Swiss-Prot record:
SUPFAM superfamilies: Prokaryotic type KH domain (KH-domain type II) (SSF54814), Ribosomal protein S3 C-terminal domain (SSF54821). Disulfide bonds: none annotated. Signal peptide: none annotated. The keyword Metal-binding does not apply. Part of the 30S ribosomal subunit. This is Small ribosomal subunit protein uS3c.
Amino acid sequence: MGQKINPLGFRLGGENQKHRSLWFAQPKSYSIGLQEDEKIRDCIKNYVQKNMRISSGFEGIAHIEIKKKIDLIQVIIYIGFPNLLIEGRTRGIEELQINVQKGFHSVNRRLNIAITRVAKPYGQPNILAEYIALQLKNRVSFRKAMKKAIELTEQADTKGIQVQIAGRIDGKEIARVEWIREGRVPLQTIRAKIDHCSYTVRTIYGVLGIKIWIFVDEQ
């Protein structure tokens, strides 16, 4: 049976995939910095869920990039629908910044948060996974949800997409894996830019796992 490596880690360090946490640390304090990054991301996601303008099942965050210096922590939030979070709120980013600072203790370091809009949100696997999760929570057929997600990626001019759902689908007693593919998804080609995400959704039947691979371009 073939072993599935994470396509992001497989391409990390090359031209197609960059690190989303940019900082250096001594080996003894590396784990502390890693936990700090996780707290920052969790605080941001919790704040977005509580303050956005639509259902709490859809955050619209593509990914979060963290850059650290000696006296500065810079956080860039790549979001597909920024109006859902900051529309009509002049101090939205300031409130988010204060909220994140409360979540972790930073000594002698400033925190700077910026929001960047993603040009084609439905070309981001995290946003698509959240969309599918929201549909599954609303008891929409999993096949219909997957096909609709593939239709949305056509707006982003992607070259291929693969969607996989695993678990007790439709409440069946035996867990199974269902997947659908449209276009090319060359996972073994290193020069191919592949976006990937794994997402967990809790339904009334149990936990379902969603995985999405998107073939963006080839160098």
